[in-house]
């Protein structure tokens, strides 16, 4: 049991660090560590992320034997590694993404028109009001950068989700669980995963979720989850997915959203990148136990040698 406690302690430390991971190297290291944690729990893991979904391009694990598939966020350059990526990205262009793109286009069009008017004014005046033109140009470039950043973020989330779906389909396996990091995935992608793999459980680790809380979402039998949560988290608020919550979370039926951090006890400074949160260690330890029991209940009692399995 000492080895299992050490593994849980490592997973606890990892979960505390994940919210502060910013650089690609740090995120990649976090993915490797998370893979080791699941391997220590006895699961065969496939890590999908920065190198695509085929063979040696995988960050870790063999997809033909994986029981847990971990998906991390992609960007536009990495999305090109996905087979039929354009078709997948076109399918993922739901109404929400279309509305976002339309809003960005309208903003850019208005700013371009304002810039043209200011240019005409500056050209007709002898003294000129070039500071207005410079200001408009700066706002235009800022809006353009934000639009490109938003489009890349949407495409990255969609690409990661559909790469996960494509990987599971290609190898014709029945994964025990899907694990998502950060904001990976879209409502449409989760719906397709649920339709194609209804037997799989969902573990959703969200560092900056609704109200900036650290959340874990589990999919399983509602009665069993309610009983387990009533025993392990008597003081926590367990919210049904029927509530008006984030669309990504609501899209997975029969799930439970567990907030392991009280929003009133945490601090978050945005958009400076500084993120500090006070985490209840006992709650995260209990969350690890519940995740282990739901994904592989038989190993909950007789998991005696995690070091050799890792």
Please provide the spans of the model-predicted regions:
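Active-site-adjacent substrate-binding region
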Residues: 35, 201-202, 208-310
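Short acidic, S/G/P-rich loop/turn micro-motifs used as interaction or catalytic elements
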Residues: 75-79, 184-187, 209-211, 262-265
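Generic beta-sheet signal
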Residues: 67-70, 176, 256
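N-terminal capping segment at the start of a domain
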Residues: 1-29, 35, 146-150, 260, ...
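Structural motif
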Residues: 66-69, 201-203
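Acidic/histidine-rich catalytic neighborhood of metal-dependent amide-processing enzymes
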Residues: 119-122, 130-232, 240-248
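Active-site metal-coordination/substrate-binding segment of hydrolases
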Residues: 71-163
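A non-catalytic alpha/beta surface segment that caps or lines the substrate-entry region
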Residues: 19-65, 82-121, 307-309
């Amino acid at each position: 049991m000492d080895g299992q406690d050490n593994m849980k302690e490592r997973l606890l430390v990892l979960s505390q660090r994940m919210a502060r991971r910013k650089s690609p190297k740090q995120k990649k290291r976090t993915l490797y560590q998370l893979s080791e944690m699941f391997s220590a729990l006895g699961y065969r893991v496939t890590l999908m992320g920065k190198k695509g979904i085929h063979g040696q391009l995988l960050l870790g694990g063999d997809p033909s034997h994986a029981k847990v598939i971990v998906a991390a966020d992609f960007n536009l350059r990495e999305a090109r590694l996905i087979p039929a990526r354009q078709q997948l990205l076109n399918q993922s262009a739901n109404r929400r993404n279309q509305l976002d793109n339309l809003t960005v286009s309208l903003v850019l069009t208005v700013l371009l028109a304002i810039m043209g008017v200011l240019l005409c004014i500056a050209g007709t005046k002898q003294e000129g009001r070039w500071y207005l033109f410079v200001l408009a140009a700066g706002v235009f470039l800022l809006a353009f950068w934000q639009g490109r950043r938003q489009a890349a973020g949407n495409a990255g989330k969609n690409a990661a989700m559909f790469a996960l779906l494509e990987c599971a389909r290609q190898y014709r396996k029945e994964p025990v669980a899907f694990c998502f990091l950060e904001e990976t995935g879209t409502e449409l992608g989760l719906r397709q995963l649920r339709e194609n793999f209804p037997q799989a459980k969902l573990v959703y680790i969200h560092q900056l979720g609704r109200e900036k809380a650290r959340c874990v979402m589990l999919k399983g039998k509602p009665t069993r989850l309610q009983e387990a949560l009533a025993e392990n988290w008597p003081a926590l608020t367990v919210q049904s997915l029927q509530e008006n919550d984030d669309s990504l979370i609501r899209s997975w039926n029969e799930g439970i959203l567990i907030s392991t951090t009280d929003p009133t006890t945490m601090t978050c400074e945005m958009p400076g990148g500084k993120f500090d949160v006070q985490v209840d260690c006992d709650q995260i330890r209990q969350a690890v136990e519940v995740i282990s029991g739901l994904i592989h209940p038989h190993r909950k009692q007789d998991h005696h040698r995690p070091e050799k399995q890792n």
